[in-house]
Regions:
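Residues in the recognition helix of alpha-helical DNA-binding motifs
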Residues: 10, 24, 35
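Residue-level "edge-of-site" marker
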Residues: 24, 45, 69
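Recognition helix of helix-turn-helix/homeodomain-like DNA-binding domains
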Residues: 27-44
Length: 84
């Protein structure tokens, strides 16, 4: 679904801190901190993960999974356009 690295990269692209992401996703700051401290793919409550992915989408980010076609291959994240 989403890796800790993708989550950190997402925040960096948006220029927001963990607290702002937590607010946007309707999650607690400790939840975001635990997610970012995860090894590789974030595991946890499905509802929390769905809220996180929906918030990143609403903020203008596109998650790239392992199966996406890209020159570099692998997972990543990119801006859809100008962030809101």
């Amino acid at each position: 679904m989403i890796t800790a690295g993708q989550l950190r990269a997402s925040r960096a692209l948006l220029g927001i801190d963990q607290r702002k992401l937590a607010e946007a996703a309707g999650l607690s700051l400790p939840t975001i901190q635990r997610m970012e401290a995860s090894e590789d793919v974030i595991r946890g409550n499905v509802d929390s993960l769905m809220k996180l992915v929906a918030a990143l989408d609403a903020l203008g980010l596109e998650l790239i999974d392992d199966n996406a076609v890209s020159q570099a291959g692998g997972r990543g994240v990119r801006l859809k356009g100008t962030p809101p």
